[in-house]
Amino acid sequence: MASEVEDGVPVHEEFFLCGGVETQIIKCGPWTNLFDKQGVSKPKHLIFVIPGNPGLSPFYVPFAKALYSLVKGHFPVWIISHAGFCLTPKDKKILTAPQEPNAQEIEDIYGLNGQIEHKIAFLRAHVPKDVKLIFIGHSVGSYIALHVMNRAPELPVVHTFLLFPTIERMSESPNGKFATPFLCRFRYMLYAASYLIFKPCPEMIKSFIVQKVLEKMSFKSELRLTDLLQPFCLANAAYLGGQEMIHVVKRDDGIIKELLPKLTFYYGKTDGWCPVNYYEDMKRDFPEANLHLCEKGIPHAFVLGFSQEMAAMVADWINNRLPKK
């Protein structure tokens, strides 16, 4: 269903079955089906946003809208949910793509490896081969973006922007040291607590709680965010988080070296997930890399209050690299 937002940026929310699970896609721009030869002329590039964890797709809408406007509407901006991070509302249809080559389920789709395969499956099914891709990975979305490029080299990715990239030593980071015991040793207790508290909770109460939480964060959402309190989604976010602590350890220097001309890294100065020494190590090991260290005080969770600033930087990078059509 498409909705025209107040600032004139068309935003579409759709739900697809991808790899056997419900997947939310939020699309900024007039293009809803890139295979459709009728209507609006097909764009040459697609900006594809891969969120962090537990970054639900609607949190990225202000960023996507700002980015779409700043690239003058030349390229659509799509945000994909992680597998298991959304439940399709009763008033929405779950769509399928006739081009989808892999209707079979993806093994361990809620885990880190499965999330990578999930993104590959969607791109192969929903994006024509002649549409070039611009990836934006945030946090663990950066790790996923790198591995999508590595595993599916046929995808026409022209550039990837890795924002606050958690691509190494996650459990050793300041936040990781705190989170690892909860995500790896006590996650079943977290599952049980979320089910006991939120499973019997009426949707009206969940919506009220989410609304109050968003007000506290000064975040206005145009799309529903009650998945924040769905035990199914919380459990999958915790499971993925635990896998991140276990598997995102050694930096994949071989992949980075091979893809380096197509990569831009943006590190935070006060980031508890990828601290400054990770940036310094990257700068030492890859002196030719396109590396940036934040000078604007933008936090790791930039979608909470810094979407405009982040979109402005990414738009400048894109506008300086790509033709305007």
From Swiss-Prot:
It catalyses: a cholesterol ester + H2O = cholesterol + a fatty acid + H(+). Keywords: Endoplasmic reticulum, Hydrolase, Lipid droplet. Its EC number is 3.1.1.13. GO terms for cellular component: endoplasmic reticulum; lipid droplet. It is an enzyme of class 3 (hydrolase). PROSITE patterns: LIPASE_SER. It is found in: Lipid droplet; Endoplasmic reticulum. Its main location: other. It comes from the Eukaryota. The active site is at S139 (nucleophile), D271 (charge relay system), H300 (charge relay system). GO terms for molecular function: sterol ester esterase activity. GO terms for biological process: cholesterol homeostasis; intracellular triglyceride homeostasis; lipid droplet fusion; lipid storage. Belongs to the AB hydrolase superfamily. LDAH family. Probable serine lipid hydrolase associated with lipid droplets. Has low cholesterol esterase activity. Appears to lack triglyceride lipase activity. Involved in cholesterol and triglyceride homeostasis; stimulates cellular triglyceride accumulation and cellular cholesterol release. Acts antagonistically with PNPLA2/ATGL in regulation of cellular lipid stores. May regulate triglyceride accumulation indirectly through stimulation of PNPLA2/ATGL ubiquitination and proteasomal degradation. Promotes microtubule-dependent lipid droplet fusion. This is Lipid droplet-associated hydrolase. It comes from Rattus norvegicus.
